[in-house]
Amino acid sequence: ISLVTAEPAFKFGGNVEATYGNFNALILRADVTGPISDTVAYSLAGNLNRRDGFVRDLGINRDVNNRSRYGFRGQLLFQPSSDLKFRLIADFDSIDENCCAVVNLVAGPTVAAIRAVGGNVVTGAPLSYRVFNNFLSTNRIDNYGITLQADKDFGKFNLTSISSARGVDSRTNQDSDF
């Protein structure tokens, strides 16, 4: 599988999308592209994805399983001739959510063990979107990267060089005694 991001265009263009849904879900996406000169073009893109939590955590008395994400990408295309081009791409995205609530479907034999060590399990109402955690889970992730791509057309073959660096900062913590 190869996913290739669209190159910046030498003609101005753009797109905006907005979606609203239940639990105050809001998804926004936008991008713009255009020329800087005869040989340089740019593109900028951004997105936002937010939603209220829809699972009630009885242990900490709040809603969890929310969505809170955003990201940006910028590109510069330098095309000095029809057979040579360079693309510089930088991106960043961030997640800060209280995710991954797992509801109890069946009160099985492990319920007594969970309660014996101080935990609790919501029983008697499968698929009720209720959980019982001892602390608030955390899911904070920042991804970032930069890429330089060079493409040269030699007529009978093409040469592509891709150099890149990626980084991630991840802080996750979850009450996983379900």
Language-model regions: role of each:
Residues 61, 67-178:
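Outer-membrane beta-barrel domain signature, strongest for Gram-negative TonB-dependent receptors
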